[in-house]
């Protein structure tokens, strides 16, 4: 057999001579492209073949005696300039063993949807493809390839593949009632709309009963159309056929209304120009195509199948995506199912698998549904909008509709229950709640405050509320004003933004500022690890004198029940006493000659003897007669009286006896990031207020110098507050209830409202 060619075999019940004559006439008319090989005619074609006008001597057309075994060509070739009878074998027939041709008479389309047009049934062992050539109203060709699947006693024909070559005209498709298990595929192509691009989605609605359809789903998700038609209704139309009107139309992407419609028309209604007005809104459906399908049920003679189909219902699942439609007509019967698929392209199975995976991933999200009673009195599943209570038949339309509620989409995660404040940040929400707490701080009497967070929806249709109640967080208070917050970072930010001008002494290690040099010196001990204060009763050491006093009061007070037998130490807990005894017995080897006290080294023992027994400080100051244990302590103390500046700044003439003060001086005066310079002395400053304060020293204004330290200022009130709060502790404003002193009347009033509120009532 030639490449690209095919072989046709003739099998007729007539005589051998008639066959030979017909074969010779046919070969002569093929102009050298065919020859006789035994009982077969071999036809060679390059790509495709169009077989027509095969007649006998009596002028009778041979419509099913011609068999095509192998024909190579494209999927489907449509030619409008050739005769209207013939067969174009599509790609689906190439794998078939036997093919049968049927030729229909040329007609104008008025008698196509009649009961007289019946597809013949052929009994074959496995599978038969029947190709029909149908002429449309405007002369266009529609090719129907029908498939008969064996498996029952009387096989019937179902439509296998349909090509609609023109969407401007109504296309008539004749299909036989299908046997369960067969597949119908419809392909539509628009030749006139190649240059038109549309972003709309295609939707298919098919009615398969005589009482109207119930549309349950639409959009990007499968839709179902229920049908309760019985076989008895089909018998009323002659051969049991009925006309199905199929609407294929374009819907705009932003349309979220209930769309679609189905209608059943009889043959007389179709020939008389049945109107579909009222079913679809023409103003909204820009592109509409109608396909009339004549469906014949040839299985009405089979009682067992008819009884089964009476109780079965058929459903259609339609998946719309872009300009490609994938739909399936599915039967609930456990033994049979009929599918109607509208697809575009060869790789249909791959597309369906990909869409099924996407649909499964999308179905993990839960959507609220509702069941209502439809116009036909049947229950209908809808998707309601929880904002405006509109109902939609698909999740896709509901998603598009939700875009009409931008306010809902822009809602914040956290919302204050006392005002209209909203935010997406938890920290901002807590800070906002703290502002309410500070305002109502005086009236607050309960111990805990409930922090209520706005409900977060589990889905756009959920109304579950989530409320969190937390305990009151630890508050960080500013020691210079009434500001307090639950975040340490916010407190540091507040100190830098509000009180940075009051911190001239800055730590060179961490950058923390202090008002006075003594505070900076105390702070620097946290970096150096120096602990100059040691307990006289134990080995406890600390960097702050106040901490030492607290330690002595709590650990070595007169009222402590547990006292050491070897030393005057007392403890408030028996375990601490036992720990002290273990340490005393195991490590203290230096015994005091005056008591049972033992020390770990000689210096501690000497300090014990001086402070407890002799009260003698061998190293005394010549100026103030203050005693010290070590000569180094006395030397450091003597520098205060002499006023000698031993630490000099390498950038200027500044001198000080304290190295920490020198560090603060260098950081605040000689750092590189000081854009503001004094025009007189060229001294640099980081902030404008510091430069302004410094300029007052050049104007001849009075400078207030502290007699206790190096603090100086031009502000009389600030100087007074400094002397009182740091040195004299002589506060002019004292509380009437606890005698606590304050620098300002406002501080005293705030103290009374906080601690003595009950006394005022």
From Swiss-Prot:
Source domain of life: Eukaryota
Annotated segments matching region Required for transcriptional activation: 515-761
Gene3D superfamilies: Classic Zinc Finger
Swiss-Prot/TrEMBL keywords: Disease variant, DNA-binding, Intellectual disability, Isopeptide bond, Metal-binding, Nucleus, Repeat, Transcription, Transcription regulation, Ubl conjugation, Zinc, Zinc-finger
GO cellular component, one term: nucleus
Ligand binding (Zn(2+)): 564, 567, 580
Cross-link (Glycyl lysine isopeptide (Lys-Gly) (interchain with G-Cter in SUMO2)): 224, 235, 296
Compartments in which it is found: Nucleus
Summary of the tissues where the protein is detected: Expressed in neural tissues.
Zinc finger (C2H2-type): 383-408, 414-436, 476-499, 505-527, 533-556, 562-584, 590-613, 619-641, 647-670, 676-698, 704-727, 733-755
Listed SUPFAM superfamilies: beta-beta-alpha zinc fingers (SSF57667)
One GO BP annotation of this record: positive regulation of DNA-templated transcription
Consequence of changing residue 601 to S: In XLID97; uncertain significance
One Gene Ontology MF term: zinc ion binding
UniProt entry tagged with the keyword Zinc-finger: yes
SMART domains in alphabetical order: ZnF_C2H2 (SM00355)
UniProt free text on domains: The sixth zinc finger contains a Phe residue, Phe-584, instead of the final His residue normally found in C2H2-type zinc fingers. There is another His residue a few residues downstream, His-587, but this is not involved in coordinating zinc. Despite the His to Phe substitution, the zinc finger retains the ability to bind zinc using a tridentate metal-binding site of Cys-564, Cys-567 and His-580. The zinc finger also has hydrolytic activity against 4-nitrophenyl acetate.
Involvement in disorder: Intellectual developmental disorder, X-linked 97: A disorder characterized by significantly below average general intellectual functioning associated with impairments in adaptive behavior and manifested during the developmental period.
Record's function text: Transcription regulator required for brain development. Probably acts as a transcription factor that binds to the promoter of target genes and recruits PHF8 histone demethylase, leading to activated expression of genes involved in neuron development, such as KDM5C. May compete with transcription factor ARX for activation of expression of KDM5C.
Complexes and interactors: Interacts with PHF8.
Family: Belongs to the krueppel C2H2-type zinc-finger protein family.
Protein's recorded name: Zinc finger protein 711
Species assigned in the record: Homo sapiens (Human)
Organism classification: Eukaryota, Metazoa, Chordata, Craniata, Vertebrata
Gene this chain is encoded by: ZNF711
């Amino acid at each position: 057999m030639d490449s690209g060619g095919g072989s046709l075999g003739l099998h007729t019940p007539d005589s051998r001579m008639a066959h030979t004559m017909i074969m010779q006439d046919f070969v002569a008319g093929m102009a050298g492209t065919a020859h006789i090989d035994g009982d077969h005619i071999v036809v060679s074609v390059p790509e495709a073949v169009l077989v027509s006008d095969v007649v006998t001597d009596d002028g009778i057309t041979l419509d099913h005696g011609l068999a095509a075994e192998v024909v190579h060509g494209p999927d489907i070739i449509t030619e409008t300039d050739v005769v209207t009878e013939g067969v174009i074998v599509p790609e689906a027939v190439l794998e078939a063993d036997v093919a049968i041709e049927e030729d229909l008479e040329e007609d104008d389309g008025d008698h196509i949807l009649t009961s007289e047009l019946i597809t013949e049934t052929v009994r074959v062992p496995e599978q038969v493809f029947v190709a029909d050539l149908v002429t449309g109203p405007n002369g266009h060709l529609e090719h129907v390839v029908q498939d008969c699947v064996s498996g029952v006693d009387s096989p019937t024909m179902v439509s296998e593949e349909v090509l609609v070559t023109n969407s401007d005209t109504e296309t008539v498709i004749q299909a036989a009632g299908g046997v369960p298990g067969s597949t119908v595929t419809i392909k539509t192509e628009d030749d006139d709309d190649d240059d038109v691009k549309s972003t709309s989605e295609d939707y298919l609605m098919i009615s398969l009963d005589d009482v109207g359809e119930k549309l349950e789903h639409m959009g990007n998700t499968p839709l179902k159309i229920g049908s309760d038609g019985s076989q008895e209704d089909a018998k009323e139309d002659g051969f049991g056929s009925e006309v199905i009107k199929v609407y294929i139309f374009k819907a705009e992407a932003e349309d979220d209304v209930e769309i679609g419609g189905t209608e059943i028309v009889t043959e007389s209604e179709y020939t008389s120009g049945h109107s579909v007005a009222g079913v679809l809104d023409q103003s909204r459906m820009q592109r509409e195509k109608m396909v009339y399908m004549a469906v014949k049920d040839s299985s009405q003679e089979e009682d067992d199948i008819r009884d089964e189909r009476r109780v079965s219902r058929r459903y259609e699942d339609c998946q719309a995506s872009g300009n490609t439609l994938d739909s399936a007509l599915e039967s609930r019967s456990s033994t049979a199912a009929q599918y109607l698929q509208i697809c575009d392209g060869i790789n249909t199975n791959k597309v369906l698998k990909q869409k099924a995976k996407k649909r499964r991933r999308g179905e993990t999200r839960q959507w609220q549904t509702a069941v209502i009673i439809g116009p036909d009195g049947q229950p209908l599943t809808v998707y309601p909008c929880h904002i405006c209570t509109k109902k939609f038949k698909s999740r896709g339309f509901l998603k598009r509709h939700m875009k009409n509620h931008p306010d809902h989409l822009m809602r914040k995660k956290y919302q204050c229950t006392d005002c209209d404040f909203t935010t997406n940040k938890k920290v901002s929400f807590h800070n906002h709640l703290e502002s309410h707490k500070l305002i109502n701080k005086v009236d607050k009497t309960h111990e805990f405050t409930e922090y209520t967070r706005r409900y977060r929806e589990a889905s756009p249709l959920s109304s579950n509320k989530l409320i969190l109640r937390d305990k009151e967080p630890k508050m960080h208070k500013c020691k210079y004003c009434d500001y307090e917050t639950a975040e340490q970072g916010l407190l540091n930010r507040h100190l830098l933004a509000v009180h940075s001008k009051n911190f001239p002494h800055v730590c060179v290690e961490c950058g923390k500022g202090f008002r006075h040099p003594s505070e900076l010196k105390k702070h620097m001990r946290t970096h150096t690890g120096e602990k100059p204060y040691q307990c006289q009763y134990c080995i406890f050491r600390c960097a702050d004198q106040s901490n030492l006093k607290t330690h002595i009061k709590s650990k070595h007070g007169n009222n402590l029940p547990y006292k050491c037998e070897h030393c005057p130490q007392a403890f408030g807990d028996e375990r601490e006493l036992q720990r002290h005894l273990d340490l005393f017995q195991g490590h203290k080897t230096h015994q005091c000659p005056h008591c049972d006290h033992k020390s770990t080294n000689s210096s501690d023992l000497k300090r014990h003897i001086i402070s407890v027994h002799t009260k003698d400080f061998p190293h005394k100051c010549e100026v103030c007669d203050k005693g010290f244990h070590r000569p180094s302590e006395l030397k450091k103390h003597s520098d205060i009286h002499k006023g000698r500046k031993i630490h000099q700044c390498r950038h200027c003439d500044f001198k000080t006896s304290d190295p920490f003060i020198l560090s603060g001086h260098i950081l605040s005066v000689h750092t590189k990031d000081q854009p503001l310079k004094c025009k007189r002395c060229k001294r640099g400053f980081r902030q404008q207020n510091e430069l302004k304060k410094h300029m007052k020293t050049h104007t001849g204004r009075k400078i207030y110098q502290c007699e206790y330290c190096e603090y100086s200022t031009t502000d009389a009130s600030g100087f007074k507050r400094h002397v009182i709060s740091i040195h004299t502790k002589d506060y002019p404003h004292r509380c009437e209830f606890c005698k606590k002193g304050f620098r300002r009347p406002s501080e005293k009033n705030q103290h009374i409202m906080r601690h003595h509120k009950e006394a005022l009532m």
